[in-house]
Amino acid sequence: MQYINIANRGVKSLSPYQAGKPIEELEREIGISNIVKLASNENPFGFPESAKKAIFEQLDKLTRYPDANGFELKQTIAKKFGVQPNQITLGNGSNDLLELFAHTFATEGDEIIYSQYAFIVYPLVTKAINAIAKEIPAKNWGHDLQGFLTALSDKTKLIYIANPNNPTGNFLTSQEIEDFLAKVPENVIVVLDEAYTEFTRSEERVDSFSLLKKYSNLIISRTLSKAYGLAGLRIGYAVSNPEIADLLNRVRQPFNCNSLALTAAVAVMNDDEFIEKVAENNRIEMRRYEDFCQKNQLDYIPSKGNFITIDFKQPAAPIYDALLREGVIVRPIAGYGMPNHLRISIGLPEENDKFFTALSKVLKFA
């Protein structure tokens, strides 16, 4: 029996998601230690102390199911961003939410629009539900919003826009986003995926929550895996109008967020000092990456995230492999249609130093 023959039609064309290589795997493969992982856009400062304390206090309660509604976390999000708890949907990471949007609002034969070089989950979930993918060619590595509008049809149900975009780091301004939303029919859901918004400067950050008052078809998706440092716990949230949130919560799995994730999220969302430290390190170290690339005549895509994507003008796989042998893990992105590029997460100064040294050795810089 070949069970692929009885699988859902959309699933047959899928391949498993390939995550960044774990440190432990590389240690087993080549037998070295002191490995630096700059592959998955994780928080280099480690797990925040505020979250550790909150989790410790929660340990004796783990025989009980978590709060299925996430009351305390919703209250925290609502207070922080000036929204109402009934606008919030919680997810097991924002990946969970990105899939939830598609399962709630699209089905076989519907169209879902996203950009070339977009986050891999968008095409994965589109294929999984056997919807029609409309991938819009990128414009200067970023979103061609006019191309999105041109692609709209009566079958369009959902649009995904990451801002900043992963893996390219491109960024849309508030005005660009609002001009776009004003032209999208209200029966088309627009998902603004803001997984990396905390790394943008406050003066240029999009005030996306204010747009919810004007555009009822907007969903804002965020994660606590990046700036907040909770990647291993899997927690994210979406904010939308209450009717959309109600529909999402009908489809959302019960107890999709565990007790430790809910508790840690409340603690770290109130830890402004930690988030500012993370963002400041990212700003300083991003400048060092840009300087390194310019000094060594390496092309890169200017990024507003916590990563930078370098164009090596040649297949990057051998460079990636050579960096592994030097104890540095970065992210190959040939799967995104960018075989000449590597994406590097911004780490701590000493981690970035190791990358600069390793890449200089691999490329034989003076």
Swiss-Prot record:
Pathway: Amino-acid biosynthesis; L-histidine biosynthesis; L-histidine from 5-phospho-alpha-D-ribose 1-diphosphate: step 7/9. It catalyses: L-histidinol phosphate + 2-oxoglutarate = 3-(imidazol-4-yl)-2-oxopropyl phosphate + L-glutamate. The keyword Amino-acid biosynthesis applies. Its cofactor is pyridoxal 5'-phosphate. It is an enzyme of class 2 (transferase). GO terms for molecular function: histidinol-phosphate transaminase activity; pyridoxal phosphate binding. Gene3D superfamilies: Aspartate Aminotransferase, domain 1, Type I PLP-dependent aspartate aminotransferase-like (Major domain). SUPFAM superfamilies: PLP-dependent transferases. Pfam families: Aminotran_1_2 (PF00155). The modification N6-(pyridoxal phosphate)lysine is found at residue 226. Its EC number is 2.6.1.9. Belongs to the class-II pyridoxal-phosphate-dependent aminotransferase family. Histidinol-phosphate aminotransferase subfamily. This is Histidinol-phosphate aminotransferase 2. It comes from Haemophilus influenzae (strain 86-028NP). The lineage of its organism: Bacteria, Pseudomonadati, Pseudomonadota, Gammaproteobacteria, Pasteurellales.
